[in-house]
Amino acid sequence: MSYTYLFRAPLDWRGAKISGLKPISFEEGLFKTRSSSSIFLSKVISAPVPFDELVGSWNAEVPSGNSLQMEARVQINNRWTPWFVLGTQKGSFFFSHKSEKKSVLAFVDIDTLKLKENSHSFQYRILFSSLKKPTILKLLAVNVSNAKGLNHAPQPFKPGPWVRELKVQARSQMLEEKKYRHDVCSPTSLGMVLDYWKIPLKTAKIAEAVRDQTSLNFGDWTFNTAFAGSFNLVSYVSRLNDLAEVEKEIAQGRPVIASVSFKAGELPKAPIKKTAGHLLVITGFTQNGDVIVNDPAAPNISSVRRVYPRLEFDKAWRINKRGLVYLISPLQGLSAIIGVPVSNLMSKPVPKIKVKLDDPLHLSQLLYGEKITLLEARGSWVKIAANEQLDFRKGHWQGYQGWIQAKDISFATNPAPNSVVRIRQAILHRGQEFLNLSVGTRLDKLGNNGSLSVVALPDDTTAEIDSSALYPFYHSIDAQSRAEIIRTAELFLGTSYYWGGRSGVQPDLSIGVDCSGLVSLAYRVIGVDIPRDSFAQKLKSRPLKNTQMKTGDLIFLSDPQNQKRISHVMIYTGGDGFIESRKSSGQVMRSSFKERFGYPLSEINYGEKVTDYSYPKPKKRFIYFGSYLEKEPHLN
């Protein structure tokens, strides 16, 4: 098992101590030095798995005359090891530091800190020395791993968007000069991936750039990824736990450099008989799950492309090398999560200095732990797609897009949730820190401590929350789950209509949500994600007749100014009633078909034009009914 910590956003280094460093914008990276001697000291990190190996990575701009050194220490049996040097960068040159004397507890083997016993905690630090120009630190990463469970068989292959082959131009290390050809599998693989990202460099140039000036070798994992990171790419060493994680990278259009080891006859069709360590590029998967690669050990360009049997490749990579990979890509397209109780999604990268209930720039709100995809960085802002709030754009479904402040995001891995906050606001206790979480926030409940529930957080810490504030995910839609939708919507009764509002946590308790935000939160509590705005909610819903309506189903109204566009949604409460966040009245309220349209539900048909009497001057609108509650896939 392995786990990788990626430190690329301000929240990722929460709790660290810095000296002589100045935080910089998210677009630029993490810090820049502001004195001749600087230090970054991480907090003590408790790993989610016991580990016996640790590998570090960094991306930085290190001017000539400056240096950067990464060190780590681990705790074994309540004893801290000394600090071990994982690598040094002096200007554009790299230096390894093999342990002079093997510690009783651990030692450095090229690029890996190896432990003689398992550890659960580690700490790392970066030491900087600077002359006139500052060093800019863009990224840090640490991978911890153990050999537990490596021998299990891989999961059966399931076809998906990873059944594809990325167009990675082939290179053969065997065509390089004799002094390189047998030792540059890593630089050759790196060259293929850099070329894929429109950074064409000759293999020999890459080899000299990543060469370890201590051992004169070319294959130090940390140095190879550090070099790639100097081209404004996100680049780090990781270990993936199975091929399914590689498949996700391929599906997103990102080739993966992988390390393999095998004995004679163990990897059919390989250009070399055996190897203790060799790097190649995974470019895709076949229909039956076999692995498509560009293997730089091939004797010529035409034979670089290979297809390796899935089972044999899995052994050579995951079992023999613990799934080691280089993950290299632009920042755009990477996944992250929201690390604050609520984040405002804006149409432009401008801060919300003052709350305006009808601010047209305010698009939506995201809750703690929600998954996002990064699209663009601009200063201290990042354009994202909200993966749990779908939108129908350019003919297909994708995350709702907008700008949030980078201080709100984290690259931590969110534990798989099994519970959800069911009250409007709930206090989460993490040591001396308190977080005010919104209804709809999803959490991983680990167990109970009296009247409190213990939950796992993305930064691998735990916290406590009142058990009565949580609800387990439903695994079926029934009368109880439908009633829970109504109960959740009722939490907002009497609050003000808030354009883009989608959270129980607002600057003032009187501030509520917009119509589709109310629906989104009510459905999240039963574990169902639906699109963000009313138009998309109607588009993806299952149409219903008026006689088919059940509690919790939805009612849609067209825009009076554009009858082809849906602009309002309400939640059916049974009988003749519904609950809504009504813009014309400025609040979340109950109403009825008879009151609003002059006729009861029984006399109003799907797609009929009705008169909306909620306006001072009644308006004509089309009305529709829809459901997500019986035939839609449900979140497990």
Please give the residue ranges for each predicted region.
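Active-site-adjacent structural segments surrounding the nucleophilic cysteine of cysteine proteases
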Residues: 10, 127-218, 270
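Boundary regions of SH3-family modules and the immediately adjacent low-complexity/disordered segments
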Residues: 330-343, 354-357, 368-371, 378, ...
